A protein has these predicted regions:
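Short beta-strand-centered segments at strand-helix junctions
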Residues: 15-27, 72-73, 77-78
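Mature exported/compartmentalized surface modules and terminal targeting/interaction regions
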Residues: 38-39, 44-116
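Short, surface-exposed charged micro-motifs
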Residues: 6-8, 31-35, 95-97
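Acidic (E/D-rich), amphipathic helical modules within compact regulatory domains
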Residues: 23-41
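Short, conserved beta-strand segments within well-ordered enzyme catalytic domains
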Residues: 17, 35, 44
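Glycine-rich loop/turn
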Residues: 1-13
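Residues that act as N-cap/strand-start positions at coil-to-secondary-structure junctions
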Residues: 1-3, 28, 90-92
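Beta-strand-rich binding-surface signature
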Residues: 15, 31, 104
């Protein structure tokens, strides 16, 4: 079984925003880790229990009215925009799926939708 979820990627602020449904689909882990498969244009997000050099903390207020989760990584955003030939002046929303069996969120970067 899988559920549809989204992330958005912004070149200008170097941020990857995880929608609340994405964090909820991963069972609100304390930390998440991002993986990119360059040749298949896939981005994966996995839950993690421990803080490491490669994990990102889930905010405690994620489900508050003003709560949000943004992973700031200008280098990753620049690399994604370059690889996907995206317009740097646009924000991209990428639909994905939660694979419950492996508790992994997968995002097909080829299905990104340009906004603004």
């Amino acid at each position: 079984m899988s559920d549809t979820i989204c992330i958005s990627i912004c070149y200008c602020d170097g941020g990857i925003r995880l929608f609340k449904s994405t964090v909820r689909g991963l069972n609100t882990p304390p930390y998440v880790k991002i993986y990119v498969h360059k040749t298949k244009a896939l981005l994966a997000i996995t839950p993690d229990e421990e803080r490491t050099f490669t994990t990102h903390k889930t905010p405690r207020n994620i489900y508050d009215e003003n709560g949000r989760m943004v992973i700031h990584s200008k280098k990753l955003c620049v690399a994604l925009y370059r690889e996907m030939n995206w317009d740097k002046d646009k924000l991209y929303r990428v639909p994905g799926r939660i694979m419950k069996e492996g508790n992994v969120a997968y995002f097909d970067l080829n299905k990104a939708e340009a906004l603004n």
